[in-house]
Amino acid sequence: MEKIYSAPITVLGAGSYGTALAIALSRNGHKTYLWGHNPQKMAQMAVRRMSEEFLPDIPFPEALEIESDLATALTRSKDILIVVPSHVFSEVLQQIQPLLTSEHRIMWATKGLERDTGRLLQEVALQILGDRYPLAVLSGPTFAKELAQGLPTAIALSSTDPQFADEMQQRIHCSKAFRVYLNSDMVGVQLGGAIKNVIAIGTGISDGMGFGANARTALITRGLAEISRLGLSLGANPTTFIGMAGLGDLVLTCTDNQSRNRRFGLMLGQGRNAQEAMAEIGQVVEGFYNTKEAYLLAQKQGIEMPIVEQIYQILFCGKHASDVAKTLLGRERKGE
């Protein structure tokens, strides 16, 4: 009988997704420590044994413990799972760097590119932490609420260290509800999770303008082609983009209104401005921040990404969505 790896794990980030992952891990029987940056909210979660803000009515398993002190949270486990918005990812790494020991291993489920540089988060981690620690990324089609409810979910995991990857797969995988696929392509897994948010904004805009299912499907398909082109230029494996971290995450985010990025796009397509849309959503819209970085990265790599470019024009250059539709439809004829 296969020996199942089990050890405590610390989750940094008590938003909806971080909390959902902590619930899933602890439900699997692993002692899990959840840290968040707001001590008052963490104290409330500890008392009420649930996240009333993000996941109301989903009680915490017994194995889930709330921790409000970062230094203490890092001593609880050698394995750290970071689940924070991409624009604060480097800040969190800088906070934990002096507190880490040689035994720590770092994984993240953050999806995005570094703000203002467009770098993959692995590059950010290597710059701040050096190459002392095994690194891993968890990415794929997962909505926090469904994960926390224990509904069937599948995801991809990639790591710089095969043993770390295998042990984390065993720990996260649950035959009843949560399936984890290993993928050796860290570049592709990270990129798919970042750029799909941008495409989801585009499909939301299209649906908000009433363009229908045909247009939505065209945007998803051509968006996948754009992600693949950019990925290949960065050394990714093309098969990654037809897997969980590519097509899987893209389809989920572009077609279901649980996606904040899609809802953000819907509001833009209905005539709301970006500030109004983000205020109504009330949580981080990763695609808004990553549109600029994706556009600049494509320019740097010399890769044609017309959908990403036009969403950038809407968000940062004041272009109207109806003009974007004309631009995309009026492009020169070409082969697929």
Curated annotation (Swiss-Prot):
Signal peptide per UniProt: none
Record keywords: Cytoplasm, Lipid biosynthesis, Lipid metabolism, NAD, NADP, Nucleotide-binding, Oxidoreductase, Phospholipid biosynthesis, Phospholipid metabolism
Pathway assigned to this chain's UniProt record: Membrane lipid metabolism; glycerophospholipid metabolism
GO biological-process terms attached to the record: carbohydrate metabolic process; glycerol-3-phosphate biosynthetic process; glycerol-3-phosphate catabolic process; glycerophospholipid biosynthetic process
GO molecular function annotations of the record: glycerol-3-phosphate dehydrogenase [NAD(P)+] activity; NAD binding
Compartments (UniProt record): Cytoplasm
Catalytic activity of the protein: sn-glycerol 3-phosphate + NAD(+) = dihydroxyacetone phosphate + NADH + H(+); sn-glycerol 3-phosphate + NADP(+) = dihydroxyacetone phosphate + NADPH + H(+)
PROSITE patterns: NAD_G3PDH
Gene3D superfamilies linked to this entry: N-(1-d-carboxylethyl)-l-norvaline Dehydrogenase, domain 2 (1.10.1040.10), NAD(P)-binding Rossmann-like Domain (3.40.50.720)
Keyword NAD attached: yes
Binding site for sn-glycerol 3-phosphate: 111, 140, 142, 196, 249, 259-261
NCBIfam families: PRK00094.1-1, PRK00094.1-2, PRK00094.1-4
Protein name: Glycerol-3-phosphate dehydrogenase [NAD(P)+]
Species of the source: Glaesserella parasuis serovar 5 (strain SH0165) (Haemophilus parasuis)
